[in-house]
Amino acid sequence: MSFFHAGPAPKGSGPCRGALRDGLDLAPGMKVGLFGGSFNPAHDGHAHVARTALRRLGLDRVVWLVSPQNPLKSSRDTAPLDERMASARAVAATVGPAMIVSDFETRAGTRWTIDTLRAVVARHPGVQFVWLMGSDNLADFHRWRGWTDIMRLMPVAVIARPGSLLDSRTAPAAARFARYRVPAAQAGLLPSLEAPAWTYLSAPLNHRSSTAIRAARAGRGEESNPIG
């Protein structure tokens, strides 16, 4: 299968018109967080972001968009897509029934995040989307292609990650859109707000990272696939 969903039938009037084509079982009126990455491999840090977003933003679903290849990263050490999808499914299952793991970028043929998000929004009218990112990504967000368009396309929630607290709070993207920042105490309103709107969510930090996991496995001579 090319997508994973562990939950009950979604609320609303049924799946959006694009659901059968892209594997995203979403209905109008749902509040949905989108979190993209290579998941090479998926780990507890990814789950931490999902759990925090579900709880603090009041989301109905979190979708992990597993990229065929991150254009900003080397492909040399990237595991095959099917292995990374399996890794993401295994970790998503620990979060709960609100998780969806999708290869939407492969299906849609998009490469850059802004193009992927535009395609998701176009295929799922009526869904309230929020782009999720760790604070480590916010520090370099201004280097992403079309990053200001992302900020204006949907609300953004930044979840604290280890080692990036100071840089992310003073990041160029945070400064550029400072007047659109929503207090964390009002984060539950974010999915219903018109973009640009963003918030920064502090939470107990999880220090797991894909890079550290790959390095540890390489040192032990293990395969990169975290699924036995």
Predicted regions span which residues?
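Nucleotidyltransferase catalytic core that binds NTPs
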Residues: S2-G228
